[in-house]
Amino acid sequence: MNETTPLLLRAARGENVERPPVWMMRQAGRYMKVYRDLRDNHPSFRERSENPDLSYEISMQPFKAFQPDGVILFSDILTPLPGMGINFDIVESKGPLINDPIRSLKQVKDLKPLQPEESMSFVGEVLGRLRESVGNKAAVLGFVGAPWTLAAYVVEGKSSKNYAVIKAMAFQEPELLHQLLNHFAESIANYLSYQIQSGAQVVQMFDSWAGQLSPQDYDEFAAPYQQKVVNLVKEKHPDTPMILYISGSAGVIERMGQTGVDIVSLDWTVDMADGLKRLPQAVGVQGNVDPGLLFGTPDAIRSRIVDVVRKAKGRKHILNLGHGILPGTPEENARVFFEAGKNVNELIKVSS
């Protein structure tokens, strides 16, 4: 057992590990009372995610409470946008709002290349502090939004139910959309490299809205740009594991496994055993407990974790939810999730 390298990093690299590492998407956030108390004093989401002291404190809250195997930067997938010349705000309960949606060739051509060390030095500072604080007790995770999902936000101007505006662009002016996606791919790759240089040991790309695409449109508008990000990052950081997450990905799991990422994060609508059959042996999995299960009983949570871990046995696996933890989740149930993940070997013995 290698005590000097965090468990999650060893697992993500495909090394033999004593148990699957466990962390949780959105593990820092509204379900935690300490977060809500801090939010009362700092109501602006952008302040909480862009002030290095606040971002660091929030990132550390779940680590102090539950000691997960991964500590993820508290930030937002839209945080790099101002560095490219796109202003946005995040309104509580409404989500992100883009002040001037991108819908013309001139707007795309006017976008600036992202220079994260200048426009986002706070991210580098937080990642460095996290590495210092957690040492080898946990891996530090960075993350970004994938090009399609960023484009969906900046073209629509806000969250959308049917993505009519960006789909109209995709099917009326595909070249315009491809230029925007290409700009985002290059900028996001640059941003990920900056996160890795600053201390991130594993990185995750969220293509949250790619599940809204048909498989053939995923092949045109999402996958090539996911691949471009992966290729550009791997050129500089070949040993940094990369994870890809898509919400509603059941129709494109095989395609996700062909993007070059090391790990595919499955949502909870796919049975773990089925998901693994659809991925190459070399590609690992993350997930995929239903976040709604954390409103259930402790026994239900433990039982599902045993089921997921059993099905993933023999493959590279990081235990996680199939989506971010939901607001209103009892904090005690988050604790049950983490403790069950850490004690899963004993739970499997008892249940067999």
UniProtKB/Swiss-Prot annotation:
Coiled coil: none annotated. Its main location: cytoplasm. Keywords: Cytoplasm, Decarboxylase, Lyase, Porphyrin biosynthesis. One of its GO terms (molecular function) is uroporphyrinogen decarboxylase activity. It is found in: Cytoplasm. Gene3D superfamilies: 3.20.20.210. The keyword Lipoprotein does not apply. It catalyses: uroporphyrinogen III + 4 H(+) = coproporphyrinogen III + 4 CO2. One of its GO terms (biological process) is protoporphyrinogen IX biosynthetic process. Catalyzes the decarboxylation of four acetate groups of uroporphyrinogen-III to yield coproporphyrinogen-III. PANTHER family: METHYLTETRAHYDROFOLATE:HOMOCYSTEINE METHYLTRANSFERASE RELATED, UROPORPHYRINOGEN DECARBOXYLASE. Belongs to the uroporphyrinogen decarboxylase family. HAMAP family: URO_D. This is Uroporphyrinogen decarboxylase.
